[in-house]
């Protein structure tokens, strides 16, 4: 599929819309609606990819697009370590949206900005199956939740928290979150839900640390 001008919007209002062919994206691609989308073909180009609407988007391809990835609604599932394209401009998750890693992926060097909390009980950054790793720097622009349904979410990149509440955990979920990156800033850290939160970095954040439920190591 070759996208022209202006930027293209793809909507699914019910069921699952599957795209298995490659997508050339020179201008911009927004995927939304109430339905779900499964994109297994590789997305290339220099422009952005945006997920909005209440449905879900699954990216499974070895993508190389270099624009910003924005999750502004629903859930974006990542099943490829390169699903989010080039690390040049990073990924942003807004309030009411969730970026979910599954299947044992390792997203390397991708900057992540989190400007919202959670959707349907899932964290703004979540692990849904397997041991999934985020190695890039994370910046909080608002209170945020990190969660794992099962197995582990590992974060080795630094976390900059200038004054917000960073929560980890999910009710009735046994997955664990391990943060080896350094948490800095004036913000707070709270362990919620079931499972274990492990902090192994030389952290310098100055806000409180609170264990509401589960275990903190």
Across the structure, where does each feature detected by a protein language model lie?
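Well-ordered beta-strand positions in beta-sheet-rich domains
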Residues: 68, 90, 109-111, 137, ...
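Glycine- and acidic-residue-biased ligand/ion/polar-headgroup-sensing regions
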Residues: 55, 71-76, 193-195, 211-216
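Repeat-solenoid scaffold signature
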Residues: 75-83, 87-102
């Amino acid at each position: 599929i070759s996208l022209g001008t202006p930027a293209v919007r793809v909507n699914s209002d019910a069921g699952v819309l599957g795209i298995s062919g490659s997508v050339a994206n020179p201008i911009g691609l927004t995927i939304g609606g109430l339905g779900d989308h499964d994109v297994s073909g590789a997305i290339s180009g220099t422009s952005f990819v945006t997920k909005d609407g209440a449905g879900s988007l699954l990216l499974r391809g070895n993508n190389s697009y270099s624009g910003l990835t924005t999750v502004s609604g629903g859930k974006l599932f990542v099943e490829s370590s390169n699903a989010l394209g080039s690390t040049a401009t990073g990924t942003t998750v807004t309030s009411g949206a969730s970026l979910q890693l599954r299947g044992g992926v390792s997203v390397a060097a991708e900057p992540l900005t989190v400007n919202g909390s959670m959707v349907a009980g899932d964290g703004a950054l979540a692990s849904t199956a397997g041991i999934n790793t985020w190695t890039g720097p994370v910046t909080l622009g608002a209170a945020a939740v990190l969660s794992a349904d099962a197995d582990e979410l590992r974060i080795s990149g630094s976390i900059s928290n200038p004054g917000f509440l960073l929560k980890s955990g999910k009710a009735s979920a046994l997955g664990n979150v391990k943060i080896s990156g350094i948490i800095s800033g004036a913000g707070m850290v709270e362990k919620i839900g079931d499972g274990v939160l492990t902090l192994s970095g030389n952290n310098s954040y100055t806000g409180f640390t609170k264990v509401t439920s589960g275990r903190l190591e």
